[in-house]
């Protein structure tokens, strides 16, 4: 294939898993085509002399033979293969890499811990929404990366020699999930963290983002158990108690924890508890991407956007030919409503952002068909890749779009976990009203309105005579009033 190919591949030879990401460049952003992950547990093959066992190397080569088949269609200049902590440590890494290069047909680069941390940060910066000033945490199999930064720039980079595989072998070797093993694992992790904690705290952060399998597992557990997606120390301690209650690693059962992740979950959990405690982290969310995404965006030389969510929404509006003027019109009305009730309802800024995002996408279902457009919209948003939005935020957007008109499905608003159920109901009410009053698709036909909230009662005041002059509008509002009353949302329109 010629070098005009739009395909790119990034391979990460990690200490616990080998990963391959294949993407296609589309109009300045990336479309994921393939993700392959295999548990190789390379770090478990290191002995006390840091010799990598033949069995571990063979597991690695076997995995690379699978990857090699997919790489044949991609120009070598558009492939990056990096190896991390275990192959930095292994004294016989050269033997493994020589054969790996032969299998893949392209160079394998062993990167330093700092370079790994930088790439992880770039992957997060390109794919994760939220505040600009962030702390990124990635717990790997044999190393843990901690990075602070603002926008695209890192301010401090650390790669520490502790990981979920090495801590498993060191502190849970007897497969016993007792308090003593957890205490020893946490104490050791805190000792590794202590020398770098001051510098990380000095640079500071507004948001903390986790980019590892441990954090992914926590997210899956919390989604399965209907909790909100924010990881807190309290939740980590609860999960530790649950693990201790299970007694042994082979008996570890937590709702939402897959068998594949269970083996290294307790060791990863102990490291994460130590990080939360030592750095006094209030809460953490899951990153949209990490090392592999950093490699891909690096090959593409794409600048980091200041607002990833806005880029995502623009791309989707273009792709599904959404009427952007109408989306903006609905967003403007919704923002105006939100600003009038936010104090009474104690709404947070993130809720405003998510409401505006729902407005930007509310007509996406029309790209399938007018009939059942809200259901089509919810399906598309639930299943599209939305960089900058967390899984729980995607679910909330889909739920809001499902309930943008017609009778309200209250249970769906209560099943999302991005915001409390009451907030989801409030955002839904504002979205529905904004869509109604922007429905004429002209700025000059949107009436001047005031919206007041008194507990759950909404009072909407329209210009004098508006309802008389707009009989269809009056009918639509009467129907909306009825639908809101069915779910005990009191609405008065004057």
From Swiss-Prot:
Entry's Gene Ontology molecular function annotations: guanosine-5'-triphosphate,3'-diphosphate diphosphatase activity
EC number(s) from the headed UniProt entry: 3.6.1.40
Keyword Membrane assigned: no
Enzyme class: hydrolase
Keywords, comma-separated and alphabetical: Hydrolase
CDD domains associated with the record: ASKHA_NBD_EcGppA-like
One Pfam short name: Ppx-GppA
InterPro entries per the UniProt record, alphabetical: ATPase_NBD, GppA/Ppx_hydrolase, Guo-5TP_3DP_PyrP, Ppx_GppA_C, Ppx_GppA_N, PyroPPase_GppA_Ppx
Pathway: Purine metabolism; ppGpp biosynthesis; ppGpp from GTP: step 2/2
Family from the record: Belongs to the GppA/Ppx family. GppA subfamily.
Function: Catalyzes the conversion of pppGpp to ppGpp. Guanosine pentaphosphate (pppGpp) is a cytoplasmic signaling molecule which together with ppGpp controls the 'stringent response', an adaptive process that allows bacteria to respond to amino acid starvation, resulting in the coordinated regulation of numerous cellular activities.
Designated name of the protein: Guanosine-5'-triphosphate,3'-diphosphate pyrophosphatase
Gene that encodes it: gppA
């Amino acid at each position: 294939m010629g070098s005009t190919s739009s395909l790119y591949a990034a391979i990460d030879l990690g200490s616990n898993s080998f990963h391959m990401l294949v993407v296609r460049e589309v109009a300045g952003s990336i479309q994921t085509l393939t993700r392959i992950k295999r548990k190789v547990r390379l770090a478990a093959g290191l002995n006390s002399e840091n010799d990598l066992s033949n069995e571990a190397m063979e597991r690695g080569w076997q995995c690379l033979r699978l990857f090699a088949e997919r790489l044949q269609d991609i120009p070598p200049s558009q492939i990056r293969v990096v190896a991390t902590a275990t192959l930095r440590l292994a004294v016989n890494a050269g033997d493994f890499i020589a054969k790996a290069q032969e299998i893949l047909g392209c160079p394998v680069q062993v990167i330093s811990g700092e370079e790994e941390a930088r790439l992880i940060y770039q992957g997060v910066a390109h794919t994760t929404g939220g505040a600009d000033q962030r702390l990124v945490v990635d717990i790997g199999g044999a190393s843990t990366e901690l990075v602070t930064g603002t926008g695209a720039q890192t301010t401090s980079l650390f790669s520490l020699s502790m990981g979920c595989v090495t801590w498993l072998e060191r502190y849970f070797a007897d497969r016993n999930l007792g308090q003593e093993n957890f205490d020893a694992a946490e104490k050791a992790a805190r000792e590794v963290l202590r020398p770098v904690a001051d510098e990380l705290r000095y640079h500071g952060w507004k948001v903390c983002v986790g980019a590892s399998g441990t954090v992914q597992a926590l997210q899956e557990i919390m989604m399965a158990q209907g909790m909100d997606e924010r990881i807190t120390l309290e939740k980590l301690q609860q999960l530790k108690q649950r693990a201790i209650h299970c007694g042994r690693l082979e008996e570890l059962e937590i709702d939402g924890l897959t068998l594949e992740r269970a083996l290294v979950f307790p060791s990863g959990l102990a490291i994460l508890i130590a990080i939360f405690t030592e750095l006094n982290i209030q809460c953490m969310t899951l990153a949209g991407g990490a090392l592999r995404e950093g490699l891909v965006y690096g090959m593409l030389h794409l600048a980091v956007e200041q607002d990833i969510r806005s880029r995502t929404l623009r791309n989707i509006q273009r792709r599904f030919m959404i009427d952007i003027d109408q989306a903006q019109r609905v967003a403007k009305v919704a923002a105006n409503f939100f600003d009038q009730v936010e104090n009474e309802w104690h709404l947070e800024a993130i809720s405003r952002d998510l409401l505006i995002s729902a407005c930007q996408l509310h007509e996406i279902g029309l790209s399938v068909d007018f009939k059942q457009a809200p259901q089509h919209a919810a399906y598309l948003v639930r299943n599209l890749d939305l960089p900058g939005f967390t899984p729980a935020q995607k679910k909330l957007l889909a739920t809001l779009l499902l309930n943008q008109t017609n009778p309200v499905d209250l249970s769906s608003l209560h099943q999302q976990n991005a915001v409390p159920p009451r907030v989801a109901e409030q955002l839904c009410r504002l979205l529905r009203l904004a869509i109604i009053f922007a429905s004429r698709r002209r700025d000059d036909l949107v009436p001047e309105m005031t919206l007041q909230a008194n507990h759950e009662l909404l009072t909407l005041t329209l210009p004098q005579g508006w309802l008389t002059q707009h009989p269809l509008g009056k009918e639509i509002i009467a129907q909306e009033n009825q639908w809101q009353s069915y779910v005990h949302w009191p609405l008065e329109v004057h």
